[in-house]
Amino acid sequence: MNIKRKPEWLRIKLGEGRNLNYVKGLLKKFSLNTVCEEANCPNQIECFSKKTATFMILGSDCSRSCGFCNVSHGALQPIDPNEPENVANAVAELGLKHVVITSVTRDDLADGGAQHFADVVNQIKSKNKETMIEVLIPDFQGNKEALQKVVQSKPDIINHNMETIPRLYPEIRPKAEYVQSLELLKNVKEMDPEILTKSGVMVGLGEGEEELIEVFKDLRGSGCDFLTVGQYLPPSTKHYPLKAYISPEVFERYKEEALKIGFSFVASSPLVRSSYNAAEALEKHEEMKS
């Protein structure tokens, strides 16, 4: 397959965009960032049109520069003390039933921004009693005390993405550690078994199928409940190069394998991103329990 030419299954239908400007205006009003825009997510038009967004806290610049990521890594900004309340107000104004909170990585902060995550969760809960809260967190450099702050705020889901297979970490996530990320997910379950955990991987980076299945097994071994698998799309020619477009049939096979391994929900298709249709995983989990 010619990897320079995007296959048909990755061509996005723009759909209805009547709420796009409304959501963007709301974000500007509350001085908020979304990972949808910062990471140039292929689903942002659809999600904005449904009046949903994944809020990105702790500024718009990251302390790391992972090879796959489009988030900028310039001068790090002071934490905005009004951000927790602003996020909570935006959630209320949008009427969200499920909100995802993520962040840039802030290795410059003593707790990696963990207390700020907790403050955001608590503010959302105070103003939006029925909203389900998912946090997509960095690794906090393995700091268990920092992780405990997030866990104690009791979000419904804690997500931490593995991103790729361990062999590719030196190129894709040079400042992260594969085992440390697995330990984070395991530690969440040890700290609070009621919190659901989630992780995501990208494909098309040069991974082998057997290597990917081993990551699935490692994640389940760490107690991970939900899994997302999506196609890597390089943001620019300066980012890590695309090695392959993965067909929808292979994504379906990955989903079947992951479900056999024991995940309670798997989203696996070319345009899946870790926050895309995030509420669906929780709905499926509740159905399985009932």
UniProtKB/Swiss-Prot annotation:
It is an enzyme of class 2 (transferase). Binds 2 [4Fe-4S] clusters per subunit. One cluster is coordinated with 3 cysteines and an exchangeable S-adenosyl-L-methionine. Its EC number is 2.8.1.8. [4Fe-4S] cluster 1 binds at residues 36, 41, 47, 275. InterPro entries: Aldolase_TIM, Elp3/MiaA/NifB-like_rSAM, LIAS_N, Lipoyl_synth, rSAM. Its cofactor is [4Fe-4S] cluster. Its main location: cytoplasm. It is found in: Cytoplasm. Residues 48-264 form the Radical SAM core domain. Keywords: 4Fe-4S, Cytoplasm, Iron, Iron-sulfur, Metal-binding, S-adenosyl-L-methionine, Transferase. PROSITE patterns: RADICAL_SAM. The keyword Secreted does not apply. The keyword Iron applies. [4Fe-4S] cluster 2 binds at residues 62, 66, 69. GO terms for cellular component: cytoplasm. SMART domains: Elp3. Pathway: Protein modification; protein lipoylation via endogenous pathway; protein N(6)-(lipoyl)lysine from octanoyl-[acyl-carrier-protein]: step 2/2. It holds the Pfam family LIAS_N. One of its GO terms (molecular function) is metal ion binding. It catalyses: [[Fe-S] cluster scaffold protein carrying a second [4Fe-4S](2+) cluster] + N(6)-octanoyl-L-lysyl-[protein] + 2 oxidized [2Fe-2S]-[ferredoxin] + 2 S-adenosyl-L-methionine + 4 H(+) = [[Fe-S] cluster scaffold protein] + N(6)-[(R)-dihydrolipoyl]-L-lysyl-[protein] + 4 Fe(3+) + 2 hydrogen sulfide + 2 5'-deoxyadenosine + 2 L-methionine + 2 reduced [2Fe-2S]-[ferredoxin]. Belongs to the radical SAM superfamily. Lipoyl synthase family. PANTHER family: LIPOYL SYNTHASE, LIPOYL SYNTHASE, MITOCHONDRIAL. This is Lipoyl synthase. It comes from Alkaliphilus metalliredigens (strain QYMF).
